[in-house]
């Protein structure tokens, strides 16, 4: 009796959804699992891409009838542009739909060792991540579903031999000979050459497992870092401290950024990731921003790396606080627990006072002279994302008197004193140190 060793064990008490095209790979897997009395729901797809596709349906449906298997059929109308990727997504959706209907998370496909080799070579030609270079995995999880590839370490030749031994019916898809697709070029030109010259196919599982072991170790370090440093009480939401990140090995840094993107379903090129890492490690550019998609930006500032949504217009983002002024501190105590006293000479301050946001040419006054507000904020290492959200207290002549947590004008004299308090005041940080 000829048998095939599966890459993963299956539970006879569970139900499995299996995609069957009618080709030798999926028909051999179907035969193998029927022989093991595995509970199956068979799904067949018609991509409407070639004539006589109805023969595939008839073959699979007939086999299901002979073996008392449930048969599910879908026609997929995929656009010609990026056909293979679009078809793969549609198949995945339909398989998950059937799995949900039959209350099982398990979905089987007949990918084999030659497919794994093709995928690895294809990834190398296009560049990928460490996980990507490992090709396909025996088991992957997506949402609530578990995708299994029992034939992943079985060579195509062994599958063909198995099908011939048991006289399993199957049909060849002539589009697999279409050299328009890079995968078919690799399948029919590159891999046959490598098979004759080296032990290429036998070494593929070792190569894949070595990469997966390295990936799993790196990802474990990534998760340890994020668990320790993300959403710490001293950090803004969706952020982590810059300093410990810079102490990590570059490969861990890259994986942290990759994981942040994966969690938001964002796909970026190797070069894009490299540019992010280069920017984060550049000490001469403390404030940087990378546009990831319409929903997310990655922000570097003096102390943090933050994943955030693009800021809405300021008129919507900030609510202007109410400035309360009094010569009596007790009168303001009920408005805000944080009062700021301001000493001044009447001739140096023009009332009324008002509150506004920072403007490009703002200047601060000190006992030693003046300084541009922009330079002052850079020296104070105020993150770029926070600078435009600063509320300034100015007099009627637009002289800056006070910036909460940052600055108090001490050049105004000391003949009189007033107290300032904000109602409905919001600032994105309470960690600034005030300069006198």
From Swiss-Prot:
It holds the Pfam family TilS_C. Keywords: ATP-binding, Cytoplasm, Ligase, Nucleotide-binding, tRNA processing. It is found in: Cytoplasm. GO terms for biological process: tRNA modification. It is an enzyme of class 6 (ligase). One of its GO terms (molecular function) is tRNA(Ile)-lysidine synthase activity. SUPFAM superfamilies: Adenine nucleotide alpha hydrolases-like, PheT/TilS domain. Its main location: cytoplasm. It catalyses: cytidine(34) in tRNA(Ile2) + L-lysine + ATP = lysidine(34) in tRNA(Ile2) + AMP + diphosphate + H(+). GO terms for cellular component: cytoplasm. ATP binds at residues 21-26. Its EC number is 6.3.4.19. Belongs to the tRNA(Ile)-lysidine synthase family. Ligates lysine onto the cytidine present at position 34 of the AUA codon-specific tRNA(Ile) that contains the anticodon CAU, in an ATP-dependent manner. Cytidine is converted to lysidine, thus changing the amino acid specificity of the tRNA from methionine to isoleucine. The N-terminal region contains the highly conserved SGGXDS motif, predicted to be a P-loop motif involved in ATP binding. This is tRNA(Ile)-lysidine synthase. It comes from Onion yellows phytoplasma (strain OY-M).
């Amino acid at each position: 009796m000829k048998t095939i060793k599966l890459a993963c064990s299956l539970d006879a008490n569970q139900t499995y959804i299996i995609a069957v095209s009618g080709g030798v790979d999926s028909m051999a897997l179907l035969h193998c699992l029927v022989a093991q009395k595995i509970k199956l729901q068979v799904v067949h797809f018609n991509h409407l891409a070639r004539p006589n596709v109805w023969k595939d349906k008839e073959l699979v449906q007939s086999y299901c009838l002979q073996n008392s298997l449930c048969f599910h059929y879908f026609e997929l109308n995929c656009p010609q542009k990026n056909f293979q990727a679009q078809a793969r997504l549609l198949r995945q959706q339909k398989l998950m739909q059937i799995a949900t209907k039959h209350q099982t998370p398990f979905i089987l496909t007949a990918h084999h060792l030659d497919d794994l080799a093709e995928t690895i070579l294809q990834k190398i030609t296009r560049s990928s991540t460490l996980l990507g270079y490992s090709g396909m995995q025996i088991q992957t999880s997506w949402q609530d579903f578990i995708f299994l590839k029992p034939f992943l370490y079985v060579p195509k030749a062994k599958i063909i031999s198995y099908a011939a031994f048991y006289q399993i019916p199957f049909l060849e898809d002539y589009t697999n000979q279409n050299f328009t697709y890079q995968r078919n070029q690799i399948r029919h030109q590159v891999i046959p050459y490598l098979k004759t010259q080296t032990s290429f196919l036998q070494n593929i599982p070792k190569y894949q497992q070595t990469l997966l072991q390295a990936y799993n170790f790196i990802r474990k370090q990534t998760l340890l870092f994020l668990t320790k440093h993300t959403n710490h009480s001293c950090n803004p939401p969706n952020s982590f401290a810059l300093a410990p990140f810079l102490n990590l090995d570059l490969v861990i840094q890259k994986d942290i950024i990759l994981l942040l993107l994966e969690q938001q379903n964002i796909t970026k090129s190797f070069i894009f990731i490299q540019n992010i890492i280069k920017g984060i490690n550049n000490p001469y550019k403390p404030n940087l921003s990378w546009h990831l998609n319409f929903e997310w930006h990655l922000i570097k500032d003096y102390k943090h790396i933050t994943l955030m949504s693009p800021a809405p217009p300021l008129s919507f983002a900030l609510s202007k606080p109410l400035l309360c002024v009094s010569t009596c501190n007790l009168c303001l105590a009920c408005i805000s627990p944080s009062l700021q006293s301001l000493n001044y000479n009447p001739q140096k301050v023009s009332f009324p006072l008002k509150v506004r946001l920072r403007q490009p040419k703002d200047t601060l006054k000190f006992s030693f002279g003046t300084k541009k507000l922009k330079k002052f904020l850079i020296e104070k290492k105020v993150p770029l994302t926070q600078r435009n959200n600063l509320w300034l207290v100015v007099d009627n002549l637009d002289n800056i008197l006070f910036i909460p947590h940052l600055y108090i004008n001490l050049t105004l004299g000391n003949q009189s004193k007033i107290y300032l308090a904000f109602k409905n005041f919001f600032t994105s940080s309470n960690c600034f140190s005030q300069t006198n």
